[in-house]
């Protein structure tokens, strides 16, 4: 009997450890962007800060890029090509590089990947809280935030549905009529507007011009609120929810981008189509369909490197203590987190993962968040085949096929060659894969 009790306790401990291993979890809200929890379904990205008082959900849509379709082939390149070769063979690489830049480069270095902005949820009276917890469960691609204000427990559940193409935010409390908040949009774009009407909040904007290339991408994001109990009112660009029992917020975004030659779509109609369909389903249906579709890909690979009690510690502590070598399960977590990020940023029919994956808070991201095809794009996709995620490769292969078309003119114009060429970088509006300085 005594041995049975010991065995049972060890079994429970093992189960507890295993349950925590594929979660990133924290005992405090994110204080900066890199600490927020990333959600994504390839088309939409969201960074969840998890602040009880002022929740910020930074949003991305994969086709929000500055500038417009363009070419920057430079016909002067061919005229100096022979001299550049001679200089290189003579060991004068710096002189060759200078000559090449003067005659092959143009003012355009590619267009930048840009943020949509943020959806903000302001919860009056939630400045002081206890029992805080937030996590990202990478087995089901769902983020959770929970905390107490007084003796009321609040839970937020968030996911970007792979099945229904929307961000779902579900708010609960263990006391009736306890949910009250204001919802608003913010965006860094100068040309933008926010309209609140009934239960719908709409952000419309135009991406920015870049390097003398005018802006062409228009975007729209909508948040629609559905409550159980309470009421929803609109006021001065905000939606105000009071005395609700349960709230579900449906969020999506779209642009006018069709392909690298065509930006004629209606972004507003696209969002309406998505959210009209989402609104026909219950929260449970949305959650179940999302998890089911995600696990079809994620669940193909298991990795077990061993377990330890370190798995019960929050993620920042595990990372700090990892050098002690007593947390093999953290390696498993990081391996599976890499697969999670690729699933979340690259799906068939969408765009490839860029330098930011799909998550970016800037108008000018580091290196513009482009597809740096001399190594970084390849590195993004190293896990695709060897970790059994072959469908994530489809956007990359489509990019290569389109570069093969646009690169024909580059090869002819700059090198007087047949075939096609691409240099070390490209972007969504990649009608010209010409040389760039970054």
Annotate each language-model stretch with its function.
Residues 20-429:
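Aromatic-residue-lined binding/catalytic grooves and analogous aromatic/hydrophobic interfacial grooves
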Residues 1-20:
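Bacterial Sec-dependent N-terminal signal peptides
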Residues 11-14, 312, 431:
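Low-complexity, intrinsically disordered/propeptide-like segments
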Residues 430-437:
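Conserved small/polar residues in nucleotide/adenosyl-binding loops
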């Amino acid at each position: 009997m005594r041995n049975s009790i010991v065995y049972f306790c060890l079994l429970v401990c093992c189960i507890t450890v295993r349950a925590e291993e594929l979660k990133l979890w924290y005992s405090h809200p994110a204080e900066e962007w890199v600490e927020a929890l990333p959600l994504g379904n390839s088309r939409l990205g969201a960074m969840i800060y998890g602040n009880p008082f002022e929740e910020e959900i930074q949003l991305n849509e994969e086709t929000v890029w500055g500038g417009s379709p363009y070419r920057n082939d430079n016909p002067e390149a061919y005229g100096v090509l022979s001299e550049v070769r001679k200089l290189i063979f003579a060991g004068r690489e710096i002189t060759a590089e200078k000559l090449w830049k003067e005659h092959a480069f143009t003012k355009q270095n590619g267009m930048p990947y840009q943020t949509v902005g943020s959806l903000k949820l302001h919860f009056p009276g939630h400045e002081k809280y206890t029992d805080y917890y937030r996590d990202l469960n990478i087995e089901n691609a769902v983020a959770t935030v929970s905390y107490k204000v007084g003796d009321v427990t609040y839970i937020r559940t968030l996911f970007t549905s792979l099945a229904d193409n929307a961000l779902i935010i579900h708010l609960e409390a263990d006391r009736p009529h306890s949910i009250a908040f204001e919802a608003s949009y913010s965006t860094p774009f100068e040309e933008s507007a926010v309209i609140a009407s009934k239960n719908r909040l709409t952000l419309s904007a135009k991406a920015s011009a870049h390097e003398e290339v005018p802006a062409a991408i228009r975007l729209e994001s909508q948040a629609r609120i559905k409550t159980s109990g309470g009421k929803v009112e609109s006021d001065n660009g905000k939606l105000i929810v009071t005395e609700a029992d349960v709230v579900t917020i449906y969020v999506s975004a779209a642009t006018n981008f069709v392909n690298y030659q065509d930006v004629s779509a209606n972004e507003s109609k696209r969002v309406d189509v998505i959210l009209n369909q989402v609104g026909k389903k219950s929260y449970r249906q949305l959650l179940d369909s999302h998890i089911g579709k995600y696990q079809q890909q994620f669940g193909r690979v298991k990795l077990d490197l061993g377990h330890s009690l370190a798995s019960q510690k929050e993620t920042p502590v595990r990372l700090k203590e990892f050098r002690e070598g007593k947390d093999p399960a953290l390696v498993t977590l990081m391996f599976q987190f890499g697969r999670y990020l690729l699933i979340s940023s690259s799906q068939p029919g969408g765009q490839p993962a860029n330098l930011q994956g799909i998550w970016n808070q800037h108008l000018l991201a580091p290196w513009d968040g482009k597809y740096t095809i001399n190594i970084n794009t390849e590195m993004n996709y190293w896990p695709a085949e060897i970790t059994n995620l072959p469908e994530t490769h489809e956007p990359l292969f489509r990019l290569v096929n389109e570069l093969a078309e646009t690169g024909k003119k580059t090869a002819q114009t700059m090198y007087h060659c047949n075939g096609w060429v691409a240099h070390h970088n490209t972007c969504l509006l990649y009608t010209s894969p010409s040389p760039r300085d970054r």
